Design a protein with these regions (language model features):
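C-terminal, well-structured catalytic/ligand-binding subdomain of enzymes
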Residues: 3-95, 125, 130-276
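Intrinsically disordered, low-complexity linker/loop segments enriched in Gly/Pro
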Residues: 80-124
Length: 276
């Protein structure tokens, strides 16, 4: 059901995400494309014969990830002429901005509307947006309003319950889908915030992974690098350069091969076959 976070430690800014799906045949793709003066990395899945970007980070360090949301009781989707499609505005945001503060300018007082969840029927969607300057928030669809939950204590975590419904509660009092993963991640990050880096991020993803976790990615935006593990095999990792548009085997492999993103993309199944 997915877990994500942004951590602003003393030395590093780190983003992390687990992508979970019970569709074991879901086709996944990594992309790095250029737009104006930016390189943009996307993690995408094939939904209804079209690749949908679940996550992205640009070379200015802006991170966006959309994952499953368990609706609050009594929730009704917005329906007004002031609505704007979530995925449309996220696409514009990652192409045009580098700071979270710029998102509100693009949104321009409009109400964001998420489509139905394509992977988990009965669930909705919510999104984490973070930048390398220490600013991050979670945006959720309210009743004729956008619900924003901002960073606290130098980090922010998103699982599958509505963050906006628990803003006044202590972290260990949340409940709902993914609450156990949220509490687990919160405890570990709090205890390791002063030395939080790539290894600590993967430890969070390992502790919050599930049987249906298909992909785990850690981003270091100040270096424009990403690290990826597949299917909870955290002994094997690849390193991605968003600037160079390359991926190379790292931990757990006999060789340290580096390859270019062909036509800007690599299919996850091909990546596995390349390094068998």
């Amino acid at each position: 059901m997915c877990t994500s976070f942004a951590v602003y430690g003393q030395e590093k800014t780190i983003y992390g995400m687990n992508f979970d799906s019970d569709d074991i045949n879901l086709k996944l793709k990594l992309k790095i494309n250029s737009y104006n003066d930016k390189n943009i990395f996307n993690f995408s899945g094939l939904i209804d014969n079209k690749y949908l970007d679940f996550a992205g980070v640009n070379s200015d360090g802006l991170f966006i990830y959309t994952q499953a949301l368990e609706y609050s009781a009594g929730f009704k989707p917005s329906c007004s002429e002031n609505d704007v499609s979530a995925f449309d505005i996220f696409d514009e945001t990652i192409k045009e901005t580098k700071k979270v503060s710029e998102f509100s300018e693009i949104l321009n007082n409009r109400i964001i509307v998420f489509p139905s969840n394509p992977l988990f029927p009965g669930f909705g969607l919510h999104t984490i947006i973070a930048d390398k300057y220490g600013d991050a928030f979670i945006i959720e669809e309210g009743i004729d309003e956008n619900i924003i939950s901002k960073t606290m204590n130098d980090f922010i975590i998103m699982t599958n319950f509505p963050n906006g419904a628990f803003q006044e509660l202590n972290y260990d009092k949340v409940y709902g889908c993914g609450a156990d993963r949220y509490i687990c991640a919160h405890k570990y990050i709090s205890n390791n915030i002063n030395s939080f880096g790539i290894n600590e991020a993967f430890e969070v993803l390992k502790r919050t992974s599930q049987e249906i976790t298909m992909c785990s990615i850690v981003f270091e935006p100040l270096k424009n690098e990403a690290y990826i593990s597949l299917k909870t095999d955290f002994e094997k990792k690849w390193k991605i350069s968003i600037v160079e548009k390359t991926i190379q085997s790292l931990d757990g492999f006999l060789s340290n091969n580096k390859i270019q993103f062909t036509n800007g993309e690599i299919f996850v199944k091909d990546l596995i076959n390349l390094y068998k």
